[in-house]
């Protein structure tokens, strides 16, 4: 809590470094986004509304890419779940709009906290939400990768692995 994270969230050095010397608690972006999802304020975000509205108006597909895990430091699987919920608010089917999800799975931050949950667990969560919202013809998991290959700091030292991710996503 002292570094701006929710009480249930374990911090890391990133959060400590961000708050050293501030003399006050400042919520992290993670805490801010989760707070907006929980309060439903997330669903009136004008930028997100414009993305979906413009996609319907122009009959263009939407691609959503990001880290999907319960690690909580770099991302949260609830971001994707909320975006699926947001998609349900728009008439994507009539417009012929497809929402393509590109979750990047994260075993690194998650395995120490919840060892029984792996990437398949999070993909199933997404699939279940898509089905619950009746979006199985509109929203799909287009592809996935692991964080280690495309996002880690040392990926630059593993150019072949990073290049595979680039090719898969392009």
Residues covered by each model-derived region:
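Acidic/histidine-rich
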Residues: 170
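Active-site nucleophile/metal-coordination loop of metallo-enzymes that catalyze phosphate/sulfate
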Residues: 1-155, 163, 167
């Amino acid at each position: 809590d002292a570094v701006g994270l929710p009480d249930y969230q374990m911090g890391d050095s990133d959060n400590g470094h961000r708050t050293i010397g501030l003399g006050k608690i400042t919520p992290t972006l993670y805490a801010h986004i989760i707070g907006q999802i929980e309060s439903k304020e997330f669903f009136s975000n004008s930028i997100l509304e414009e993305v979906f509205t413009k996609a319907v108006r122009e009959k263009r597909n939407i691609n959503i890419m990001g880290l999907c895990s319960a690690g909580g430091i770099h991302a949260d699987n609830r971001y994707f779940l909320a975006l699926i919920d947001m998609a349900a608010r728009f008439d994507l089917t009539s417009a012929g709009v497809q929402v393509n999800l590109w979750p990047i799975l994260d075993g690194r931050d998650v395995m120490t906290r919840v060892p029984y949950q792996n990437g398949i667990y999070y993909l199933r969560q997404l699939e279940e939400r898509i089905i619950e919202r009746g979006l199985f013809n509109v929203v799909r998991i287009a592809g996935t990768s692991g964080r280690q290959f495309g996002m880690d700091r040392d990926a630059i030292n593993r150019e072949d692995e990073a290049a595979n991710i680039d090719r898969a996503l392009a």
